[in-house]
Amino acid sequence: CRTTDTRYNVVRMGDAMAEVFGQAGISVLHDRTLYDYPEYAGSYDRSLAAIDRYLKEYPSIRFVLDVHRDAIETADGGQVKVVSEIEGQGIAAQLSLVVGSDGGGLSHPNWMENLRLAVAIQEQALTDYPTLMRPLLLRNSRYNQHATHGSLLLEVGTAGNAPEEAELSA
């Protein structure tokens, strides 16, 4: 369910991921802005402006991860949740990497670098957690991934997953 309450939305997933990356010694700049509020229209333009601003302010940024929760509905409008049992930890929301390309006609000359990164992440994740990842998706849209190298979209479960399931995926 879509909400602006950061205890239940994608910002919480970003908080959890930032904590895990930080514990691994990886510096994180976590933008907690809801770019799709109050409406979806223009959300990618708004987030692209922020990405450009951050890249100028912090030129050492090596990766941009756009975190989403997928929306999968049943024929009657119910929410589908995607799960993976993580041994000894519980039920986690499955993850899906989405890679944009220039297939829609917009310039994205380095999309294959992002695809290689996604494949490497997918392979490692499947080695460590065999059921955690859904199939990698290659799309014709850019999803602002043209702004920099090392840019991916990550779907953390779906709107049907409990926040705790999505948080465990971090």
Which residues does each predicted region cover?
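Extracytoplasmic/secreted envelope proteins and their assembly/folding machinery
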Residues: 14-18, 45-52, 115-122, 151, ...
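Active-site microenvironments of hydrolase-like enzyme catalytic domains
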Residues: 51-102
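Loop/turn elements at helix/coil->beta-strand transitions in domains of secreted/extracellular proteins
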Residues: 24-27, 59-63, 93-94, 130-132, ...
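Solvent-exposed loop/turn segments at secondary-structure junctions
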Residues: 34-38, 69-74, 102-105, 141-144, ...
